[in-house]
A protein has these predicted regions:
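Conserved beta strand-loop-helix elements of the APE1-like EEP
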Residues: 91-92, 121-139
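N-terminal, active-site-proximal structural segment of metallo-dependent hydrolase catalytic domains
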Residues: 15-110, 114-124
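Metal-dependent phosphoester-hydrolase catalytic domains
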Residues: 15-16, 154-156
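Short, surface-exposed beta-strand/loop micro-motifs that present aromatic residues
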Residues: 158-161
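Bacterial Sec-dependent N-terminal signal peptides
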Residues: 1-19
Length: 161
């Protein structure tokens, strides 16, 4: 009986399959705007003179906090690695993404980003952070939002990256 259990145990060990595990995340950046106006965008609330009094201190604090949160994502399962890719919403432009990936916690992992300027009048876009050692994008496409109701036909908003 003991030999049968040993044989079954050895067979079970040999039958195990190895899997690669990658972390994938998503984080709404909750209006990650810089302090400069983007021509053609309604980003006036996020200027130093705007309703949010969005200044350099608020902007740099937000960058630092978001970078720390993004770098921590997935480390409970993959310590020192984190997520291979992280979808982002509510980012203003490539400038804020440059500043975000330059933050020490993200720069240490070498994150890059994909960003496509969308039609949202407020200047809110989607982006994808990725670790090029773990993920290589093949194509980039912004799929536009298609209104479902006739009253939504004039509503321009961000699409899907």
């Amino acid at each position: 009986m003991l030999s049968l259990l040993l044989v079954l145990g050895l067979l079970r060990l040999n039958a195990q399959t190895n899997y690669s595990v990658y972390g994938v995340g998503f984080y709404n950046q909750e209006n990650l705007f810089d302090t400069c106006h983007d021509e053609g965008k309604k980003d006036y609330d996020f200027l130093p003179t705007g309703s949010y009094k969005w200044d350099k201190l608020k902007y740099t604090n937000k960058l630092r906090n978001m970078a720390r949160a993004l770098a921590d994502m997935g480390t409970d399962v993959l310590p020192k690695v984190g997520c291979a890719m992280i979808g982002l919403s509510e980012v203003e432009n490539a400038r804020v993404l440059d500043a975000l990936v330059a933050q020490p916690p993200l720069a240490a992992r070498g994150y890059r980003y994909i960003h496509v300027e969308g039609p949202d009048r407020r200047g809110i876009d989607c982006a994808l952070l990725y670790n090029p050692q773990l993920f290589t994008p093949q194509t980039v496409k912004l799929v536009p939002y298609i209104p479902q109701l006739p009253k939504d036909s004039a509503f321009r908003t961000r699409g899907y990256l």
